[in-house]
Amino acid sequence: VNDELIEILGSENYELNLKSKPPAIVLLAGLQGSGKTTSAAKLAKRITKTSNKKVLMASLDVYRPAAQEQLEVLGNQNQIQTLEIIKNQKPLEIAERAVNFAKSEFFDVLILDSAGRNQVDDKMMKEIVTISKKIKTTERLLVVDSMAGQDAVNTAKHFNTALDLTGILLTRVDGDSRGGAALSMKSVAKCPIKFIGVGEKVEDLEEFHPDRIANRILGMGDVVTLVEKAHEEINEKEAEDLQKRFLKGKFTLNDYSKQLNQISKMGGISGLLKYLPGLNEIKNKIEESNAVSYTHLTLPTTTIV
């Protein structure tokens, strides 16, 4: 069963193509409310962190109130530069200005957050297709809400026909039934899933690995991803120092706070349990443990004060 699931999901994982002549242009498309703007920030943060590349974000959404400002705020919060907002510019003009700015300032990657559109809105679809062709995008990713069910699959088929997608970014996979939406998405839309959003934090974006998702669907956990998250979030030197302190029988409130902070960075106790075999089903029963942990994080500071 596991082998069949992997075959359905795709036997390999697909990486972003960022090897083109800078800047590599990544265009995010999708329906309204699918999470494109947040996903743009998550993707930019991930590329910056894992590939050590200089990333610029730009919003092409001139229709939704404060959409451009939202991306600017996310950029400021995560130390990612965004294109200066100039009012009354059309999406294509913004895209061309973003490309020119990215070239002049030597950015490696440009992420374009397009406006959310209705799949039956031909005018909006033509607009994004024109933008993609004019600026010669490197990657065209469709952002899809995995909770949308069959609608998500239909959306992927429609966008793939119009835009010739290079990949899919599934959001809210943490709320889905362990990733079941990914099954029909890959087989029906004929487009590889490249990333999955597994939470609300900017760090909660993972590369899509078919074998790991198959294990999650079958309730077998995903220990490899857990190890990778631990490697990303835990400072190796601090961990070694803490281990030496433990062996000497020393453990302070500050040490306790650091341990809880590390767990918090990795998604809390319930966030860790979903990666362990057989424990995903009980994680919802201990959600309150996260709240307790966050409260305890303030104890050392409160005690000192």
Task: List where the protein language model places each region.
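Primarily NTPase-proximal linker/entry elements flanking Walker-type ATP/GTP-binding cores
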Residues: 1-60, 67-88, 95-103, 108-114
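Residue-level signature of catalytic and energy-coupling elements of molecular machines
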Residues: 31, 61, 113, 140, ...
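Switch/coupling sub-region of P-loop NTPases
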Residues: 74-164
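Conserved phosphate-handling catalytic cores of large alpha/beta enzymes
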Residues: 119, 128, 132, 139-248
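Conserved P-loop NTPase/AAA+ ATPase motor core
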Residues: 243, 251, 255-262, 270
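Small-residue-rich helix-loop
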Residues: 279-293
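Conserved small/polar residues in nucleotide/adenosyl-binding loops
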Residues: 295-301
